[in-house]
């Protein structure tokens, strides 16, 4: 019996996506990553069909005994590698994690201070996103243009004058750490809470190449589980025993999630174990690669942001491409060559230019997980030059990209031997391992 045409189309699209993005492109989106085959093997399980409202061992459904076990184990593992006391894995994204925290800390009309948009504040921190939807007034802290960061002295003065309910640090264009330990005492002095959005840098924190916000004075930390932490898409909230965490945890259900996508839990646990054993080497290679790529692009004539600061301390590189037509044009041109990046506002762009900003945001974390190192960053920079500066034939560059990827198809920083997994596979589900 042949498949209906509609079904064939679904299968064709899915296969095309897998072939294209898994084997033929340089994936340089800073907010993406790839799970290991090991994590993927437990992602598809019976958990994907089940519900478990509430917290482990305090559910509103029956049939959750293994859900309770895996969720508790995953939280314990995440606390271990994060060096934290509290973890909640129920947020289904970093933005949902932010929403839960913001809603508990303030009422409509209250004020919150955020890192300036020029320093990379995420849209959920602004009036255009979650804060605005909750009716919380956001005020941007002053920007230090030279250091591409929060202006510490001016921010302290603003905190003392405004007396906000909370202050948010962290961002989405995030080259350098925000001044957590410098601001924390002043935030607490006015009775406010310090929230750190570590969505982009969570894997770097675990890998000990980025300082821990909780150890520097943050009251609560929100994360994504699919950026520099290479797990399934989702969110999480951490604290070091703060009362705020308890309040937030009580409201995640039923305010922000009902069921929390249980199939994420085994894959998150596996990724946490991988990060426990391989996270430091992975994070160190990420930061070496980002710096190598930034330097290689600068050497080839690109205007890379942050030259006076060493370009970057994270997984990201930011490039001003105004002279070549702007971020929108260049991101599309690179995609034609199978190089996947995103257009991005740069510190001197106005928010209304979001559709055609000055820059590109590049992330090296996924290609690092496929085994690329500094020498490959040189090659990638040369490919950028061929497309953007030299204006080489796009199809020829595309062939070079595909040839390059042939040597980088296997996920690294994981456990190699998959044979032992067969005894855990459900024959009825036919898990792919």
Swiss-Prot record:
- CDD domains registered for this protein in UniProt: SHMT
Q: Which GO terms describe its biological process?
A: glycine biosynthetic process from serine; tetrahydrofolate interconversion
Q: In which pathway does it act?
A: Amino-acid biosynthesis; glycine biosynthesis; glycine from L-serine: step 1/1
Q: Which UniProt keywords apply?
A: Amino-acid biosynthesis, Cytoplasm, One-carbon metabolism, Pyridoxal phosphate, Transferase
Site annotation (Plays an important role in substrate specificity) points to: 226
Which positions in this protein are listed as binding (6S)-5,6,7,8-tetrahydrofolate?
121-123, 243
The catalytic activity of this protein is classed by the Enzyme Commission as: 2.1.2.-
Positions of post-translational N6-(pyridoxal phosphate)lysine modification: 227
Report any Pfam family annotated for this entry.
SHMT
Q: Which PANTHER family match?
A: SERINE HYDROXYMETHYLTRANSFERASE, SERINE HYDROXYMETHYLTRANSFERASE 1
Classification via NCBIfam families: PRK00011.1 (NF000586)
Designated name of the protein: Serine hydroxymethyltransferase
